[in-house]
Amino acid sequence: AGIDRKNITDIGSKSPDEVVEKVRFIVTGSKHGYRPKSVRRKDIPKPNGKTRPLGIPCIWDRLVQQCIKQILEPICEAKFSNNSYGFRPNRSVEHAINRTYTMLQRMNLHYVIEFDIKGFFDNVNHSKLIKQMWSLGIQDKRLIFVIRRILKATIKMPDGSLIEPHKGTPQGGIISPLLANIVLNELDFWVASQWEENPMAVSRGKYRIIGKTE
């Protein structure tokens, strides 16, 4: 739960029409426009002993993000690289692994190169992201305004202090995985162009290029 400590069951008594009306009011009802509540920071332990920072929005802000995702996803899916499998509908890590095995067996490929993007979610450039959205055809200024507000939502740390983010998109947000795919889509196509003769599969966060021995 976010800083309001509420979850989906807390609004379960409302009818669908009431939920839609509430979301509409949150986004457009104020003269200042949409203002998401602070995102709650929570550190999740990782197997290597480090922690993964999550940013958990309040329940109504999560619903706003879900609405945005349902608008953006079909537009983006039509323009994403076919080599990308992470955070996409009807695709998964298992699909990427299966494709890798198929290529290894059928195309006389013998090695895999893997690389990772360290701290990706925490370092997304907001201006670059908005430009990439625009180039994908997402050009509704009201929608972009709301997404900017989501990216700039203050982060409430465990000690109660507030941080104003200038980069990054919080892991834990509904639309963060989709925004990540928008940012990395250009890289997906660039990697494919550099290794045209050798196929690749992307399980988001890690790139695997499969090739032949010399």
Give residue spans per PLM region.
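Charged boundary/loop elements
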Residues: 1, 70-83
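Non-catalytic, polymerase-adjacent accessory regions of viral genome-replication enzymes
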Residues: 1-17
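Inter-domain linker/hinge segments that demarcate the starts of reverse transcriptase
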Residues: 22-31, 101
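Conserved polymerase palm-domain catalytic core
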Residues: 38, 42, 79-83, 88, ...
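Residues forming anionic-ligand binding surfaces in small-molecule and nucleic-acid pockets
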Residues: 42-50, 72, 163
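Conserved phosphate-binding loops in nucleotide/dinucleotide-binding enzymes
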Residues: 53-54
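Active/ligand-binding-proximal structured segments within catalytic/core domains
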Residues: 63-72, 179-183
